Regions:
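Charge-patterned, long linear interaction tracts outside catalytic cores
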Residues: 3-21, 31, 318-352, 356-358
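Flexible glycine/proline-enriched surface loops and loop-helix/loop-strand junctions
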Residues: 2, 14-18, 28-34, 87-92, ...
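Hydrophobic alpha-helical scaffolding
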Residues: 7, 11, 21, 25, ...
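Conserved structured core elements
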Residues: 11, 15, 26-29, 43-50, ...
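Long, well-ordered, tryptophan-enriched scaffold segments
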Residues: 1-74, 78-79
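A cross-kingdom feature strongest in bacterial/archaeal respiratory oxidoreductases
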Residues: 102, 111-116, 131-135, 165-298, ...
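A glycine-rich, hydrophobic/aromatic-adjacent loop/helix-cap motif
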Residues: 33, 49-201, 272
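Acidic/polar loop patches that form or flank catalytic/metal-binding clefts of enzymes
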Residues: 44-47, 60-62, 85, 114-124, ...
Length: 492
């Protein structure tokens, strides 16, 4: 049933998500007339666009004569597409209310059935991935000299996965995965220097950074953050951030304040891999990855930072860098690329594994990099026509994705209209569960951890008169300067 109330076996009453959707979004506050002035689009235009989207999606389907089988075993003779494509990333998501705005757009896509169909928005391999049970962040417990039990970044399933102490204070310096930023999936690197300067949530002795130029990038206050690195504690005379180690290829604001600078190479002078484990370059037609090989020999005293990290790990005899007899495992990053395994059979590169014919998974191959070079430094796996669409529920695709190591099991990936993880955070704020937010964050968590998308004015509008300056500017870096900022731009 899509609507109505159901009594569960345990006696509790429950309603389908669509009942909750209708109960919220049919309220007068969501009517076109209620939002027209706010968004600057007349109500009649909003209704016209909505009608056009619905007409195209449901009355003008894009149909491919391609049979496929879903995860329930049902065979479909055609692929029915809803030719409405919606995209949201930088722009909408750059605003402080963008999280829920993007969620609203994704909900619209799900209601239209315009997810990975002919003519609609499509997944790029190795996605989609099931969430949950994506691995949660690790770091609640740790021991010096031993590796973390998993990745420091991950996907919290609820308050139980937050990296907080018993009293609710953050365990990470950047406060990611705390009650202040429970869904900080990429970490909050822009808060690293301000938090280290403030000693909040704790003081640190060393800040060690690579390439980010955090004195300028993402700080929104270059002068203020630069002063933080030079400021001393009047009580002790010591710097508030005692030691800063930084590696970069060029001079920058952060280099100027570093105690130790490790000169890096440019991307033209080192080995790199564009990995399925990091930021993959796959397409809707299949997974892909690539390498960079050095084409210039450095003419100065520099070393690739990846090589430096491997050397440090080896000299410190850290697990994963030395064998049981104390000998080094990797000579350099070049060897690491083909030799390292995240888990048995899975490494940084997916192509030419094992005997050189393996795709996705396979034993490390000493000739892997040579095979990439012979293939113009790229590897790509082409999906079949049957696997090309409905990847979250396409039996053939999910079996292939499992075989390639992109997912753990060939099971349907359920798309959540109602976010269960957000519901758990809201319930905690309402007093349920063992892990509770601090009282000062309880109201905020209850409001914003809404399992259904909401809209609210950008937070900065509360700090100034929005009517006096109603425009919101979003800056965008050119691709060539994506990892080179401010004073570094002169070098490009």
């Amino acid at each position: 049933a899509l609507v109505g109330e159901v009594v569960l076996p345990n006696g509790l009453a429950a309603v389908p998500v669509f009942e909750l959707l209708a109960g919220r979004y049919l309220l007068p506050e969501y009517a076109p007339e209620s939002v027209a002035e706010r968004c600057g689009v007349p109500a009649e235009t909003i209704r016209r666009i909505a009608a056009e989207i619905a007409d195209v999606a449901f009355n003008q389907p894009l149909v491919l004569n391609q049979p496929w089988t879903d995860t329930a075993g049902r065979r479909h003779e055609t692929m029915i597409g809803r030719p409405v494509a919606i995209h949201a990333m930088r722009g909408i998501s750059a605003h402080s209310n963008g999280f829920h705005t993007c969620r609203a757009l994704h909900m619209l896509q799900m209601l239209l059935g315009a997810i990975d169909t002919p003519g609609s928005w499509r997944y790029k391999a190795p996605y989609p991935k099931p969430l949950p049970p994506g691995p949660p962040p690790v770091g609640k417990t740790w021991e010096a000299g031993k590796p973390l039990a998993g990745s420091p970044l991950g996907f919290p399933r609820g308050p139980e996965d937050l990296l907080v102490a018993a009293d609710g204070t953050p365990l990470r310096l950047d406060k990611a995965f705390s009650w202040e930023a429970p869904l900080g999936l990429h970490g909050l690197m822009h808060m690293l220097l301000p938090n280290a300067h403030a000693g909040d949530p704790y003081p640190v002795d060393v800040v060690f950074m690579y390439m980010a130029n955090m004195a300028w990038n993402s700080s929104m206050d270059p002068l203020g953050v630069s002063r933080m690195m030079a400021e001393k504690d009047p009580a002790t005379g010591a710097y508030r951030i005692p030691h800063i180690i930084y590696s970069d290829a060029f001079y920058s604001e952060t280099v100027a304040y570093a105690d130790l600078v490790l000169p890096d190479t440019t991307y033209l002078e080192r080995w790199d891999c564009i990995s399925l484990l990091d930021r993959p370059i796959g397409s809707p037609h299949g997974p892909a990855d690539a390498i960079r090989q050095p084409i210039l020999k450095p003419d100065r005293d520099v070393r690739p930072f990846q090589d430096v990290l491997i050397e440090l790990g080896t000299r410190l005899k850290l697990p994963g860098f030395v064998a049981a007899d104390g000998s080094r495992i990797y000579a350099d990053y070049k060897e690491y690329i083909w030799k390292h395994e995240r888990k048995p059979g899975t490494g940084p590169l997916g192509g030419f594994r094992g005997d050189g014919t393996g795709n996705g998974v396979g034993a490390p191959n000493p000739g892997q990099l040579d095979a990439y070079i012979a293939n113009d430094c790229f590897w790509r796996y082409e999906l079949s026509e049957e696997e090309g669409y409905f990847k979250h529920a396409n039996k053939a695709y999910l079996e292939t994705a499992t075989r390639l190591g992109m997912i753990g099991a060939p099971e349907q990936i359920v798309l959540q209209l109602y976010s269960e993880p957000l519901a758990k955070f809201r319930l905690a704020a309402q007093g349920h569960g063992k892990v509770q937010p601090p009282d000062r964050l309880r109201e905020r968590t209850a409001r914003f951890a809404d399992p259904l998308p909401i809209w609210y004015p950008p937070l900065e509008d509360a700090m100034e008169d929005a009517s006096a300056y109603p425009l919101h500017a979003v800056t965008q870096r050119p691709a060539a300067m994506y990892h080179s900022w401010h004073s570094q731009n002169a070098w490009l």
